[in-house]
Amino acid sequence: MKHFLLILGSLCAASGAIAQTPNPFMSELKQFYTVRKADLLKAADRMPAEDYNFKPTPDVRTFGQLIAHIADAQMSFCSGAKGKPIRLNAAAKTTKADLLASLKASFDECDGVFDATTDVIATQMIKTGNSEHSKFWALLYATLHDNEEYGYLAVYLRLKELIPPSTNSR
């Protein structure tokens, strides 16, 4: 009987701790997003302005084009999740300063959406092109896309003999 009461007490205590964590899905997704956000901003800043036109082979994007792509995609996903799609048009920019400003603007948009999205709100459906997805899907996809693109940026940095931020912080 003592074992049963001990187990029951432990379960009750654990369920209370879980209940105290509001929005566990969005909280965990935001943690992942926040880590990658820091890495992307540091990577964009770390690459010298004169190397924003660098591309390892002729058939891939330049470093600057990757930054623009990240900013444009992020703005699309996050503003779409908010229900008010915004076109950033970072692809039209070429200088490091302008591209960094676009990247920061896309993160500002995403920060607001992540802050306002609870687990319940995340289940709401939104139109994405010809499909419908949950707001959670849009924010998850934005975060996964950031992760993928960061991997490319890390290679570009290494090819320029620069240490990627995620490695540097270890």
Q: Which functions belong to the PLM regions below?
A:
Residues 1-22:
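Bacterial Sec-dependent N-terminal signal peptides
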Residues 10, 46, 69-72, 105:
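Residues within well-ordered alpha-helical secondary structure of globular protein domains
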Residues 20-27, 86, 95, 99, ...:
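Iron-associated oxidoreductase/ferritin-like identity signal
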Residues 22, 33, 59, 70-71, ...:
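Generic structural signal for well-ordered secondary structure
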Residues 30-31, 38-41, 51-89, 127-170:
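Short, contiguous alpha-helical
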Residues 43, 94-127, 134-145, 149:
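Acidic/histidine-rich alpha-helical segments that form the ligand environment
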Residues 46-52, 114-122, 158-164:
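Surface-exposed helix-capping loop/turn segments at secondary-structure junctions
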